[in-house]
């Protein structure tokens, strides 16, 4: 057994078994207590849908904290420059993201607001956010919250094989809108204004919707990192200032 990597600051680890070429993702107990991840047994319906729609490789929940994952490797290098320099590749990528919305929404009832509440309730550090939960809910509900979203799209979670995109690591899937997944990709990959305009054009999702969710991506990033790092961490402090400004200006 070869350990490939730790995920999410140590709440899971990924291993490869050489004898059967399978990947195993093993979760620690803090994944469900500290980081509020969904119990694996509830992932089965999602994984079935993903495999049926050819959005991801085959996953099997084989124990309370263990997932067996079919091994697949990219057969071509993928980076942001290459993605945006090829209209065909970018459209293919965006079409595959759009297919995520075809997943039966009954696989989950968890929305972004529930994710925010998990991090802020009973946490004195986030009382300012918690007091604005109702306003945040209204802000989110400007767009329908009825599509399954990956919730953590970045190049590290994307594989391209035989010109098909596969999305991995669905730990943060939620009900939201197509624009949220595009915003999260733009946020995590630090896309330029021109690149965001391009994904809006090809995806036919308005710039307004994508930009609407960018501060929500920043808020979630802050809440997650504040669990991982101390309050005086420079990244956390900078994010907090931006989150405070968003709350004061928009809620």
Regions from the PLM with identified roles:
Residues 10-11, 23-62, 67, 78-96:
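A conserved alpha-helical element in kinase catalytic cores
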Residues 2, 22-23, 66-67, 164-165:
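Hydrophobic residues embedded in beta-strands of well-ordered beta-sheets
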Residues 179-206, 215-234, 238-246:
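Active-site activation/catalytic loop segments of kinase-like enzymes and analogous catalytic loops
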Residues 1-19:
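ATP-binding glycine-rich phosphate-binding loop
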Residues 16-17, 26, 68-71, 159-160:
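Conserved hydrophobic "DFG−1" position in protein kinase catalytic cores
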Residues 13-17, 136-180:
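Active-site acidic catalytic loop and adjacent metal/ATP-binding pocket
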Residues 102-151, 239-242, 249-250:
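An alpha-helical support segment within catalytic cores of ATP-dependent transferases
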Residues 29, 66-83, 117-118, 219-232:
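A glycine-centered beta->alpha junction motif in the catalytic cores
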């Amino acid at each position: 057994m070869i350990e490939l990597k730790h995920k999410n600051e140590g709440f899971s680890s990924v291993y490869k078994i050489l004898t059967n070429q399978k990947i195993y993702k093993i979760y620690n107990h803090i994944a469900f207590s500290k980081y509020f991840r969904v119990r694996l047994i509830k992932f089965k319906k999602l994984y079935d849908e993903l495999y049926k729609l050819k959005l991801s490789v085959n996953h099997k929940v084989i124990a309370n904290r263990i997932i067996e994952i079919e091994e697949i490797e990219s057969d071509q290098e993928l980076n942001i420059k290459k993605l945006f320099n090829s209209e065909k590749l970018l459209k293919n990528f965006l079409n595959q993201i759009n297919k995520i919305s075809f997943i039966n929404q009954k696989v989950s009832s968890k929305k972004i607001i529930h994710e925010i509440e998990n991090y802020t309730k009973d946490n004195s550090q986030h009382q300012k956010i918690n007091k604005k939960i109702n306003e945040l809910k209204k802000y989110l509900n400007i767009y329908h919250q009825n599509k399954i979203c990956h919730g953590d799209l970045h190049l590290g979670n994307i594989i391209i094989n035989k010109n098909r995109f596969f999305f991995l690591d669905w730990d943060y899937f939620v009900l939201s809108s197509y624009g949220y997944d595009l915003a999260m990709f733009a946020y995590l990959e630090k896309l330029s204004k021109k690149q965001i305009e391009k994904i809006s054009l090809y995806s036919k999702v308005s710039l307004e919707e994508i930009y609407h969710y960018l501060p929500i991506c920043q808020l979630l990033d802050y809440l997650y990192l504040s669990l991982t790092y101390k309050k005086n961490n420079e990244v956390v402090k900078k994010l907090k200032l931006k989150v405070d400004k968003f709350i004061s200006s928009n809620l």
